[in-house]
């Protein structure tokens, strides 16, 4: 089987939406019956984004096999059925780390190790490995053409196109086509210069995606085609839209998938986008709306919670309601009090690290519990709910996590020192372990209690969810908390770790150690988020009476 590659680059400015464009194109090709996957190549020197600040980089998306990856992989999984893995994302840091390890072992037999051929060969090997078994692979190159960091990746894909044959390789370039109000027209010169920059590297784009706040007129697209040496039908206008789920239809309407299939000589049926049309219909025709407060510490960059925000929207689609998300800084709860939580239909506390703002989260969990407001806690959101219950219901004054107060009297949350990974191997950690790549990561099995709310929501007794944490409920103190009324609704497959807790005498209070947002999609949603949004809607109706 021959694998075809589409290399996706961006020019002029960053944040044009390469990830959304690649994912949308992949969704169309998948709808034509093709086996598609997407890769993201990041030029930064970090080995992975696992230890990067969420405020700088956005969320860390965790794959089933436990890789900590770029948030674009979340977009990929929300648009296509193919599951991402550690093969779908790698960085400059990972490449250099691998090459230097080989050099130390003597694998290069005394050769002078250089960017060309050693670094570029390592990049090509990983791209080919990630594409095995697929009809089409989209490879997104992070950054902007012209960045010094991107040069080894651009050189590698230039070589790769020659290696596999140009009949199996396409270059798709996203550029900005700005509209100047003073002139009353869009300007194509930035696109021309961006393509010129690509040509200087040896890459002639085959497809140009023109990003603008409005549709790029046909005469301007013809002008771009002429000056950039690209067929006119391969100059695609991608205007701003009110929903990213409209992009597949926008690209298909301009024949992009037909052009690609002809170039690759792929015989496949027309794309059926009815599932996406249904998503767009549900999004545009809600029967109501709810307001959900998300209390976190990284709210100045919403992308830090990208998958959670999307999962809440998916929950809204499943309930035919619009979800208005109010981002609340947990430190504001500490300084201004729980008054700022009034008028919310539900409260969610997402994952996070560090002591800053944690008391505000604990106060938020208490407010939700005592006022019968639907509550969903994720990762740290479960831990603060447990700490709050231990302090205020179980009589364990000053209960805390050893992450925040190492010598606290009641360490109800503590470091996991031992667990089994996805392959069944025992992992061991201590306080002295490195921060990077040392958490309990990836898909893990969870057994649900028969009498639990989550058992009803999932409709199954065993589930698999993705994790990213190094602290867990302390089983040594669990019995005292359970005796006070807290329900353990889910445990790990080996019965060693608490995965889900519930407050039984509450309309809807669920907190989980795993990250359900990573498996929520617009077409399928997720049981927890669908149930949570439904509970928010029901709470709103009760309050209106």
From Swiss-Prot:
Residues 1-266 are annotated as: Amidoligase domain. Mg(2+) binds at residues 72, 140. UTP binds at residues 14, 187-192, 223. Pathway: Pyrimidine metabolism; CTP biosynthesis via de novo pathway; CTP from UDP: step 2/2. InterPro entries: Class_I_gatase-like, CTP_synthase, CTP_synthase_N, GATASE, GATase1_CTP_Synthase, P-loop_NTPase. Residues 291-542 form the Glutamine amidotransferase type-1 domain. GO terms for cellular component: cytosol. L-glutamine binds at residues 352, 380-383, 403, 470. Keywords: ATP-binding, Glutamine amidotransferase, Ligase, Magnesium, Metal-binding, Nucleotide-binding, Pyrimidine biosynthesis. One of its GO terms (biological process) is pyrimidine nucleobase biosynthetic process. Its EC number is 6.3.4.2. Belongs to the CTP synthase family. Homotetramer. Catalyzes the ATP-dependent amination of UTP to CTP with either L-glutamine or ammonia as the source of nitrogen. Regulates intracellular CTP levels through interactions with the four ribonucleotide triphosphates. CTPSs have evolved a hybrid strategy for distinguishing between UTP and CTP. The overlapping regions of the product feedback inhibitory and substrate sites recognize a common feature in both compounds, the triphosphate moiety. To differentiate isosteric substrate and product pyrimidine rings, an additional pocket far from the expected kinase/ligase catalytic site, specifically recognizes the cytosine and ribose portions of the product inhibitor. This is CTP synthase. It comes from Salmonella schwarzengrund (strain CVM19633). The lineage of its organism: Bacteria, Pseudomonadati, Pseudomonadota, Gammaproteobacteria, Enterobacterales.
């Amino acid at each position: 089987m021959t694998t075809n590659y589409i290399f996706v680059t961006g020019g002029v400015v960053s944040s044009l939406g390469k990830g959304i464009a690649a994912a949308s194109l992949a969704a169309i090709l998948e709808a034509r019956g093709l086996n598609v996957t997407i890769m993201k190549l990041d030029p930064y020197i970090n080995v992975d984004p696992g230890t990067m600040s969420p405020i700088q980089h956005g969320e860390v998306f965790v794959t089933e096999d436990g890789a900590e990856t770029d948030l674009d992989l979340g977009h990929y999984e929300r648009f296509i059925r193919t599951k991402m893995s550690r093969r779908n994302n790698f960085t400059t840091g990972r490449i250099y780390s691998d090459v230097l390890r080989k050099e130390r072992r003597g694998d290069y037999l005394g050769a002078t190790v250089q960017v060309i051929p050693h670094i570029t060969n390592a990049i090509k090997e990983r791209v080919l490995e990630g594409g095995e078994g697929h009809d089409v692979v989209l490879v997104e190159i992070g950054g902007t053409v012209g960045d010094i960091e991107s040069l080894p990746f651009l050189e590698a894909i230039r070589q790769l196109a020659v290696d596999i044959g140009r009949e199996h390789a396409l270059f798709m370039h996203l550029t900005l086509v700005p509209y100047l109000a003073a002139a009353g027209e869009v300007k194509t010169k930035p696109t021309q210069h961006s393509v010129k920059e690509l040509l200087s590297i040896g890459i002639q784009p085959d497809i140009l995606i023109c990003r603008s706040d409005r549709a790029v007129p046909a005469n301007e697209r013809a002008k771009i085609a002429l000056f950039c040496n690209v067929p006119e039908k391969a100059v695609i206008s991608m205007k701003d839209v009110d929903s990213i789920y409209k992009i597949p239809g926008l690209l298909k309407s301009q024949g992009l998938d037909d052009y690609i299939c002809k170039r690759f000589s792929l015989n496949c049926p027309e794309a059926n986008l009815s599932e996406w049309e249904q998503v767009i219909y549900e999004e545009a025709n809600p029967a109501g709306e709810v307001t959900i407060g998300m209390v976190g510490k990284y709210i100045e960059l919403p992308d830090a919670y990208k998958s959670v925000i999307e999962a809440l929207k998916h929950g809204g689609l499943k309930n035919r309601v619009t979800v208005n998300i109010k981002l609340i800084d947990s430190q504001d709860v500490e300084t201004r009090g729980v008054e700022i939580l009034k008028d919310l239909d539900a409260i969610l506390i997402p994952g996070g690290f560090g002591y800053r703002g944690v008391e505000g989260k604990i106060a938020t969990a208490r407010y939700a519990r005592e006022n019968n407001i639907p509550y969903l806690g994720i990762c740290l959101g479960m831990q603060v709910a447990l700490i709050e219950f231990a302090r205020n219901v179980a009589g364990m004054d000053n209960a805390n996590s050893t992450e925040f107060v190492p010598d606290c009297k009641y360490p109800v949350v503590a470091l996991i020192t031992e667990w089994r990974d996805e392959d069944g191997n025992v992992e061991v950690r201590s306080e002295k372990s490195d921060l990077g790549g040392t958490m309990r990561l990836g898909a893990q099995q969870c057994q649900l209690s028969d009498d639990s709310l989550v058992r009803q929501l999932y409709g199954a007794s065993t589930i698999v969810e993705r994790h990213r944490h190094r602290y867990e409920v302390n089983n040594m103190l669990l019995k005292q908390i359970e005796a006070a009324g807290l329900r353990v609704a889910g445990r790990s497959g080996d019965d060693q770790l608490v995965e889900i807790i519930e407050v039984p005498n509450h309309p809807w209070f669920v907190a989980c150690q795993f990250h359900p947002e990573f498996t929520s999609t617009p077409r399928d949603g997720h049981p927890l988020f669908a149930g949570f949004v439904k509970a928010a809607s029901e709470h709103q109706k009760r309050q209106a009476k």
